[in-house]
């Protein structure tokens, strides 16, 4: 029995040698190093067609807010201050000075907007809604009812509203019902 267990462990360890590493993933797309700050990528796969004789009639989606500004001012100030001191000391390379300039612009743009939805975040939800509309037009015909819910966090509400605005641009006859309130505890992880 011990030999069987050792053989199985050896087999799995050999198979793991063929697995992708984080380093390989980052070489393909450095932005993935941003972890949960990585902007939502557009899908690159095609949809599976509906089975013969079947047609879409309903869509249910659960989404997180789009890209947002960092939550704390310090998350902008810390790298800015490091780069400022290095720049003032003449220790930055040409590339370092460019990074310092970009960090300065980002810091200024985010000022007093900590945690709010970015323009990219709003655009992401319009794009998601447009893909739903393009992929399943029959669901959005005529006076179809759209029932949307959000947490009371403003970036979530604005994300939802951007998606709804995009859908109504495609079909102004849609009946939209949207709501955001603390009574919807299931959206708040039960903490509402």
What are these regions (language model features)?
Residues 21-192:
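Long, internal stretches of domain cores in catalytic or enzyme-like folds
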């Amino acid at each position: 029995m011990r030999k069987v267990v050792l053989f199985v462990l050896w087999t799995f360890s050999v198979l793991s040698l063929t697995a992708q590493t984080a380093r390989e993933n980052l070489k393909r797309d450095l932005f993935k190093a941003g972890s949960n700050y990585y902007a939502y990528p557009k899908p690159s796969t095609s949809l599976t067609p509906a089975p013969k004789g079947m047609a879409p009639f309903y869509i249910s989606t659960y989404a997180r807010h789009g890209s947002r500004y960092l939550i704390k001012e310090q998350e902008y100030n810390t790298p800015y201050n490091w780069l400022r001191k290095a720049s003032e000391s003449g220790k930055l390379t040409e590339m370092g000075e460019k990074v310092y300039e970009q960090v300065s612009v980002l810091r200024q743009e985010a000022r007093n907007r900590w945690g709010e939805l970015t323009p990219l975040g709003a655009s992401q939800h319009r794009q998601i809604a447009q893909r739903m509309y393009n992929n399943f037009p029959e669901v959005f015909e005529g006076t179809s009812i759209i029932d949307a819910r959000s947490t009371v966090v403003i970036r979530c509400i604005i994300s939802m509203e951007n998606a709804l605005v995009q859908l109504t641009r495609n079909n102004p006859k849609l009946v939209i019902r949207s709501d955001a309130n603390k009574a919807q505890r299931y959206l708040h992880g039960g903490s509402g």
